[in-house]
Amino acid sequence: GIGRRQRQMCIRDSLSSFYFDIRKDVLYCDSINSKKRKNCVIVLNIILESLLKWFAPILVFTTEEIYSLVNKSNSESIHENNFVKIPAQWKNEKLNEKWSNLFKIKQEANIAIEEKRANKEIGSSLEAEIKLILKKDKFELLDKLDLADYFIVSKAEKELSKNDDIKIEVKKAQGQKCERCWKILEKKCERCSKVLQ
């Protein structure tokens, strides 16, 4: 029914193909002390706690077993806990609209990247370099994002458009592939070098 479709949309579309995908690099390659990585771990813990509680009535023993491994409270059973309290300030319609628009830009970029992959010009998206040519409203949406991480490419830049609402140019990234993070960079990968020291 509707509940099943909503769960699938949440887990498959929002988490698996979006959040988990763009955060893999941070989790695997950033320093264990990196603020970005620590914030990501906090979010993943909130997601895990919420999903465990959500599935507890259906997957009684499985959720109990997982809970016993990750339990940080004094409660012996997940079934004795309340649902995770989500702060009221997290319900933010402006932020929701912003991310909805960002998601649409990402979908457009994914289509452009997939065309290059289908034509065998690149293998994975990390072999790509993208340029986003956007009108002012969309251009400003990307201001505080690490574009290469968000689009899962080796290099990303944006340019203000005078005509097109959105235009995305994709080409093969130039440089050497970092053996650790797999990004193709013109210089030695500073992040990975620092982490390995």
Mark where each language-model region is.
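Short functional micro-motifs and their immediate structural scaffolds
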Residues: K183-E186, Q197
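Short, low-complexity export/processing leader segments characterized by acidic and small residues
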Residues: I11-D13, N81
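Short cysteine-rich clusters marking metal-coordination/redox-active sites
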Residues: C178-C181, C189-C192
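Single conserved hydrophobic/aromatic residue that forms the stacking wall/gate
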Residues: G1-I11
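Extended, charged helical/alpha-beta scaffold domains that provide interaction surfaces
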Residues: E127-V153
